[in-house]
């Protein structure tokens, strides 16, 4: 199986690894992101099978313009991977700047909706696949996860609702929900604190970007009569935390 796939957030982590995997498998890949220089480097690495488009998915007009301007040979999109997303900060809710919450909502939710809404007609026409990158944070709350977890819960529910709305049209929708993954994600979350990022994953043997790329490829490779509704995965060394209990004195 091969075709054309669009991956948001292709400048690093899951998105970059997924672009590399799908080009290797013979697909045409459209990679989006805000860092044009990284898209140019990826294009130099992957060749003519990769087309990079630099724009901000939170900007509705920029999204429309960028996607409407895709060149011939890259317009018939079979798979949309909504990967772009971020978490900012690890502090409890009362200590988080409102701007950080707004940025997470804008990127993780609004940006995803902008891209998905624009591409739905093509995906319906081609009986395509929508793959949304959610998180185990959609299910399991943790300290400092407040708005980030809320945005990922939205992605999971949106995936289920979209699948319901598109029932009978042959479009498949999947929510992939990873646990601890070692990418730039934590470096961004900690404001560039490399030591804090390294310590988080020390001794964990976390999920890698290649693991997620392989998972996305597996989902996309299923027979057309099978829909993977959701797929939750964790490293073996990660499990479930106990409930917090506050004891009054």
UniProtKB/Swiss-Prot annotation:
Tree of life domain: Bacteria
Entry annotation: catalytic residues: 148 (proton acceptor)
Keyword Transmembrane among UniProt keywords: no
Reactions catalysed according to its record: L-serine + NADP(+) = aminoacetaldehyde + CO2 + NADPH
Enzyme class (EC, first level): oxidoreductase
SMART domains per record: PKS_KR
InterPro entries: NAD(P)-bd_dom_sf, Sc_DH/Rdtase_CS, SDR_fam
Residues involved in NADP(+) binding: 6-30
EC numbers for this chain: 1.1.1.276
Keyword field: NADP, Oxidoreductase
Positions of substrate binding: 135
Entry's pH dependence statement: Optimum pH is 9.1.
Any GO molecular function: serine 3-dehydrogenase activity
Oligomer status and interactors: Homotetramer.
Its job: Catalyzes the oxidation of the hydroxyl group of serine to form 2-aminomalonate semialdehyde which is spontaneously converted into 2-aminoacetaldehyde and CO(2). Also acts on D-serine, L-glycerate, D-glycerate and 2-methyl-DL-serine. Does not act on O-methyl-DL-serine and L-threonine.
Family classification: Belongs to the short-chain dehydrogenases/reductases (SDR) family.
Name the UniProt record assigns to this protein: Serine 3-dehydrogenase
């Amino acid at each position: 199986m091969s075709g054309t796939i669009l991956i948001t957030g292709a400048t690093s982590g899951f998105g970059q690894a997924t672009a590399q995997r799908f080009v290797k498998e013979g697909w045409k890949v459209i990679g989006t992101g805000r860092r044009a220089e990284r898209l140019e480097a990826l294009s130099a690495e992957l060749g003519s099978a990769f087309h990079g488009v630099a724009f901000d998915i939170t900007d509705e007009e920029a999204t429309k313009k960028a996607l409407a301007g895709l060149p011939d040979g890259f317009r018939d999109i079979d798979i949309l991977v909504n990967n772009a997303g971020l978490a900012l900060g690890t502090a409890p809710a009362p200590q988080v700047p409102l701007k950080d919450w707004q940025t997470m909502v804008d990127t993780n939710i609004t940006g995803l909706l902008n891209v998905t809404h624009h591409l739905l007609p093509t995906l319906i026409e081609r009986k395509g696949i929508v793959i949304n990158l959610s998180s185990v944070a959609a299910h399991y709350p943790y300290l400092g996860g407040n708005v980030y977890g809320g945005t990922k819960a939205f992605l999971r529910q949106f995936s289920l609702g979209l699948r319901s709305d598109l029932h009978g049209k042959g479009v498949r929708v999947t929510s992939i929900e990873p646990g601890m993954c070692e990418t730039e994600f934590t470096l961004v979350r900690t404001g560039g604190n490399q030591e804090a990022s390294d310590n988080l994953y020390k001794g964990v043997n976390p999920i890698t970007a290649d693991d997620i790329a392989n998972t996305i490829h597996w989902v996309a490779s299923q027979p057309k009569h099978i829909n993977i509704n959701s797929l939750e995965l964790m490293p073996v060394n990660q499990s479930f935390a106990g409930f917090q209990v506050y004891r009054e004195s």
